[in-house]
């Protein structure tokens, strides 16, 4: 039996990316269990540290701009990488 719950929280497009041969684009679960299992067992809303939108998709909507914009992201920590990823979409 294979458990895929956490990887699907980390990247809901996991299967599509794998089927398309784009494994390098999969947002990988780091196995921290902090926002998924700890929150679940603590009676809190489940989420994911590598995908903060997990279980919050209807609340955290990204609205595309009318036209493309050039931006600069300063920093390569988790917040900077997440901001760059969202901006690229």
Show the residue positions of the predicted features.
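Flavin-dependent oxidoreductase catalytic cores
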Residues: 1-74, 78-89
């Amino acid at each position: 039996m294979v458990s895929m719950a956490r990887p699907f929280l980390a990247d809901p497009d996991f299967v599509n990316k794998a089927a398309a041969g784009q494994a390098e684009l999969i947002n990988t679960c780091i196995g921290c269990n902090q926002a998924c299992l700890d929150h679940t067992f603590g009676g809190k809303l489940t989420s994911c540290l590598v995908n903060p939108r997990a279980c919050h998709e209807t609340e955290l909507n990204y609205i595309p701009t009318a036209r493309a914009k050039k931006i600069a992201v300063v920093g390569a920590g988790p917040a900077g990488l997440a901001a760059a990823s969202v901006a690229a979409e």
